[in-house]
Amino acid sequence: MEDYTKIEKIGEGTYGVVYKGRHKTTGQVVAMKKIRLESEEEGVPSTAIREISLLKELRHPNIVSLQDVLMQDSRLYLIFEFLSMDLKKYLDSIPPGQFMDSSLVKSYLYQILQGIVFCHSRRVLHRDLKPQNLLIDDKGTIKLADFGLARAFGIPIRVYTHEVVTLWYRSPEVLLGSARYSTPVDIWSIGTIFAELATKKPLFHGDSEIDQLFRIFRALGTPNNEVWPEVESLQDYKSTFPKWKPGSLASHVKNLDENGLDLLSKMLIYDPAKRISGKMALNHPYFNDLDSQIKKM
């Protein structure tokens, strides 16, 4: 830690306080995440250290790079590249009645998918994607932050400030207690973020797990074994769930064209095995008119 000075506290993440800092010799500005673990006495589990060390290998233009892992007084500090704005703050800053430019929505979605495909190809899941951990710079680049931390530390039910961790972007298989899940969980989250890029509003904003599920069911219909084989045998599926009929996504997401709605519907397919993959999503016609500079990134 002696290589870095803390400049100021910039926020509170899922796992602890985040500081803006500076490397003493290079002058490079960084984000320093202090990881607060449940069991302070035992120190940091070696499994977490191993997991985190692997994340230093994830180098991609759309992934916030982990530059250093430091220990101080049995506290773990993760040193990341610094970006000053997250997507939630950006969406909140757009004046009422105005929306993000449709070409920027497309560019951001494409970059998010590029980042996710890179990580999925290395068998790393995110599991907790949301606008707060998508960081942007002033050049139109968006990067995914906090990759792999869920596996290293678990996802707490509450942030250490006792704020409840958001469920709005969580996939139905996770909400229904599936023990085995994979890369499609991230695609679902990206789908809900895609809708929010277009409308500035969370697509499904539940305030409990059951409320979250019912908001999804009301929009997309209550799933059954016909549309999603074996869903009825998932741990938290109840035969007493109200049986809603599928509605139209277009009524929930007004600012997307036909191709955009088609891609969104493929990202929000109930059956994880049928949900579009990141790689397939990048080749969807929605991106046909995307600036070739972004495709080359």
Swiss-Prot record:
Modification sites for Phosphotyrosine: Y4, Y15, Y19, Y77
Modified residues (N-acetylmethionine): M1
UniProt-listed InterPro entries: CDK, Kinase-like_dom_sf, Prot_kinase_dom, Protein_kinase_ATP_BS, Ser/Thr_kinase_AS
Residue positions, PTM N6-acetyllysine: K6, K9
Compartments (UniProt record): Nucleus; Cytoplasm; Mitochondrion; Cytoplasm, Cytoskeleton, Microtubule organizing center, Centrosome
SUPFAM superfamilies named in the record: Protein kinase-like (PK-like)
Inhibition and activation profile: Phosphorylation at Thr-14 or Tyr-15 inactivates the enzyme, while phosphorylation at Thr-161 activates it. Activated through a multistep process; binding to cyclin-B is required for relocation of cyclin-kinase complexes to the nucleus, activated by CAK/CDK7-mediated phosphorylation on Thr-161, and CDC25-mediated dephosphorylation of inhibitory phosphorylation on Thr-14 and Tyr-15. Activity is restricted during S-phase in an ATR-dependent manner to prevent premature entry into G2.
Keyword Aminoacyl-tRNA synthetase attributed: no
Phosphothreonine PTM positions: T14, T141, T161, T222
Residues joined by cross-link Glycyl lysine isopeptide (Lys-Gly) (interchain with G-Cter in SUMO2): K6, K9, K20, K139
Record-annotated Protein kinase domain positions: 4-287
A GO biological process held by the record: rhythmic process
Reported function: Plays a key role in the control of the eukaryotic cell cycle by modulating the centrosome cycle as well as mitotic onset; promotes G2-M transition via association with multiple interphase cyclins.
Assembly with partners or alone: Forms a stable but non-covalent complex with a regulatory subunit and with a cyclin. Interacts with cyclins-B (CCNB1, CCNB2 and CCNB3) to form a serine/threonine kinase holoenzyme complex also known as maturation promoting factor (MPF). The cyclin subunit imparts substrate specificity to the complex. Can also form CDK1-cylin-D and CDK1-cyclin-E complexes that phosphorylate RB1 in vitro. Binds to RB1 and other transcription factors such as FOXO1 and RUNX2. Promotes G2-M transition when in complex with a cyclin-B. Interacts with DLGAP5. Binds to the CDK inhibitors CDKN1A/p21 and CDKN1B/p27.
Family: Belongs to the protein kinase superfamily. CMGC Ser/Thr protein kinase family. CDC2/CDKX subfamily.
Protein name: Cyclin-dependent kinase 1
Gene: CDK1
